[in-house]
């Protein structure tokens, strides 16, 4: 099937230009000023087309925790949020820490409506499995407590993982950020620092950053602070926790000065009833609200569209070496998001696609929303409706 997106403005390297996009067999085949005959046409007048977002940090909860989310519902939420590719974390039940479980997750993910890849879990005794794991985004190392029981404490194990992994993604807080930077400098790997949340952590990164070290920030640390706990209570509890306004301001500054490389959701859904328990779990959903929050912030001059596409499309593809994604370019996969900067609406819990059916941003009025999401040339989300067309696992560049 061929598809033409016409009359829209397209965002290439942050520059807005008037071009039509012709898509054939899942690929962007032509960027042109002409109208090419196609099987289907989308009129994107008054709208902007950006590369589909790549969310490099999600917890779609399958296997073992599917009351909270699964690959179908999580991918529906992602598509509704303009996300066309996700990288799923390993702390499921059982955790993705050996090849058999990785294969099982690959089978389960086949129902996903957005493209997918996997982070592989590390334990104190799975180095042989880590060495054998192929086509993964990273090896995930937990140095601070979070959902699941994958936290590592043995120094030798941690060093060994760093020496035997091309890319290590870490949950490291406070001084553990500095520790992982030192370990990366002693080995030859790349380091991806997940959900940086404080000024202190940013200081460590600024001192130690090189071209093998990358830092991620989440929307909840950009848009909520510890003060929001008064109202939201457990519904704003996650790991790492919300910080001060000073920390939040430092994160925004780090986005503009290039210290932060990606924005990813850390989409970590739990059911409302679980969040109301005395021993509630930590984590918040985020796939559906990431792009609207950023587009709204853009219209308040906090961030540019160029920066949004760099941090949410281009950089994740580069960092994790995801093939043919992250740019609007001839020959690249037709993963595209059409946004309407004039569309203003309220976030409503009951309209969300995520299985948990709540958001910490419920009732927030946001201006700028994705209206159409195209995955591999297929229209998966359009005007509030989902089309269930299965996507595929990502390929990685050598």
Predicted features along the sequence, with ranges:
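Histidine-centered catalytic micro-motifs
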Residues: 52-63, 169-172, 217, 265
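Metal-associated gating/positioning segment near the N- to mid-region
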Residues: 47-110
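Histidine/acidic residue-rich metal-binding segments in metalloenzymes
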Residues: 128-263
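A glycine-rich helix N-cap at a beta->alpha junction
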Residues: 107-122
């Amino acid at each position: 099937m061929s598809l033409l997106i016409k009359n829209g403005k397209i965002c290439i390297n942050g520059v807005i230009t008037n071009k039509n996009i012709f898509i054939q067999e899942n690929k962007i085949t032509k960027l042109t000023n002409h109208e090419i005959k196609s099987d289907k046409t989308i009129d994107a007048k008054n709208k902007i087309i950006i590369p589909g977002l790549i969310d490099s940090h999600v917890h779609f909860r399958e296997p073992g925790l599917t009351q909270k989310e699964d690959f179908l519902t999580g991918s529906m939420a992602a598509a509704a949020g303009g996300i066309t590719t996700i990288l799923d974390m390993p702390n499921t039940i059982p955790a993705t820490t050996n090849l058999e479980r990785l294969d099982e997750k690959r089978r389960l993910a086949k129902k996903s409506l957005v493209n997918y890849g996997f982070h592989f879990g590390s334990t104190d005794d799975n180095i042989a499995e880590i060495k054998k794991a192929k086509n993964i985004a990273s090896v995930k190392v937990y140095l601070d407590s979070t959902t699941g029981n994958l936290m590592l404490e043995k120094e030798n194990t941690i060093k060994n993982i760093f020496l035997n992994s091309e890319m290590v993604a870490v949950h490291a807080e406070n001084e553990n950020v500095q520790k992982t930077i030192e370990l990366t400098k002693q080995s030859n790997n790349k380091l991806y620092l997940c959900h940086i949340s404080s000024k202190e952590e940013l200081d460590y990164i600024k001192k130690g950053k090189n071209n093998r070290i990358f830092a991620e920030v989440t929307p909840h640390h950009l848009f909520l602070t510890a003060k929001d706990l008064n109202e939201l209570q457990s519904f704003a509890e996650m790991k790492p926790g919300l910080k001060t306004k000073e920390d939040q301001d430092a994160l925004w500054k780090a986005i503009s000065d290039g210290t932060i490389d990606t924005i990813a959701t850390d989409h970590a859904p739990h059911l409302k009833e679980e969040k109301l328990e005395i021993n509630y779990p930590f984590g918040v959903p985020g796939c559906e609200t990431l792009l609207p929050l950023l587009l709204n912030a853009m219209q308040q001059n906090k961030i540019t569209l160029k920066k949004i596409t760099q941090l949410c499309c281009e950089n994740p593809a580069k960092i994790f070496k995801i093939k043919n994604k992250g740019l609007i370019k001839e020959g690249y996969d037709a993963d595209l998001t059409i946004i309407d900067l004039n569309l203003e609406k309220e976030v409503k819990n009951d309209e969300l696609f995520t299985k948990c059916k709540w958001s910490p941003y419920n009732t927030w009025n946001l201006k700028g929303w994705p209206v159409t999401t195209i995955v591999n040339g297929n229209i998966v989300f359009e005007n509030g409706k989902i089309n269930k067309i299965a996507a595929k696992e990502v390929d990685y560049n050598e």
